[in-house]
Amino acid sequence: MVGGRAPKSPQGQRPSGLNRAAASLGIVAGVVFVAAMIFFSGWTRGILSGGHNHTGPATTGPGGMMGPGRKMGPGQTPPSAFVAVSVATVWTTPQSPRPVDRPALTNPVDIRGWLSDMTPAQQQALTSDNLNQTQALFGDRVFVVGEQGDWDEVVVPGQPTPKDSRGYPGWIPKAQLTTEPAYGALKEHAPFALADRGITTWLYRESGLSDQDLEISTNTRLPVLSRTDKAVQVATPDRGPKWLDARTVAVYEKPTDIPHPTGADLVRYAAVFVNVPYLWGGRAGFGFDCSGFTSAIYQVHGITLPRDADAQAADSQGRPVDKSALQPGDLLFYSHGSKDSDNPDAIYHVAMYSGNGEMIEAFDSTTPVRITAVRLDTDYWGARRYLDQPR
């Protein structure tokens, strides 16, 4: 994506958007926001000792956030937690992970090690045994709706699904989540830096960008604290203020400020991920599944689609497109069953049309992200367009 960056602030000054954000809040929210800024400013100066939990679970006292074994009742507002690892896999149940999955359960997490440790059969079992559901990125908010032992049952907002109106459901180890009201206030109200310039980028411990702290995925969004000409200082859930290379992110005051893309914009960015590994449930630059890939590419460009392929096909944002009229950025769907374009229930795969009779896709556990010829075989279900002006 080209452009869309907020004007740079003089070195050492906060971007004016922070002041506007505070001014636009109500009294109570404004107090929380200012307190959050003081909290993180103090952390930057080193006047805070302790108080943050880098590796611990998201708890507020004995028994965790909700007490041992409790679930949310009808009408209750679930408490928030924040992802404290570069990418947290959302599992189907606490019993789903196998011994080979341990690198994906720790803090810090080792997604690349996990992928390299799995045999092809173990990769395929993630799909066939329905072991995992999706992923959430560093700093993302999740809602905790229950818990079991060392696990929190969550829903992930920003990943729409018919399964739950609040977000995508599943389970995350408590060790990968944290709570921090100051961070939550900034997440809600401050301008944010969006990682949108490559597969992954790094957080740094200082503005000189020489001391790497944590590798994070494309589509990660973190609240902005300040800027220099070369770096953006951001708040993190449990690591204190960190810095991002300004060349790898765009800064926006609110999500609706992200420029609306063309189909060519989507395809250019999708092509960056060619040869990234396939990972069932993957939705990060470390590995994608088919619908995690398409939904992430669109979301980086300010458009939120449902998480799963069948729900993407059914989404009201999409308009049917004849195969003779495909444009870059259109999504192509494949089904083992009915080819009725009004019935997406049997859809098993989605790809993005990239032009010239080709598409880009995260196909299966033996195939990394690739550009290949469009398949218009018996499994082709139809296409949907989500842009008003796809070119």
Where are each of the predicted segments found?
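N-terminal Lys/Arg-rich, disordered targeting/topogenic segments
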Residues: 1-19
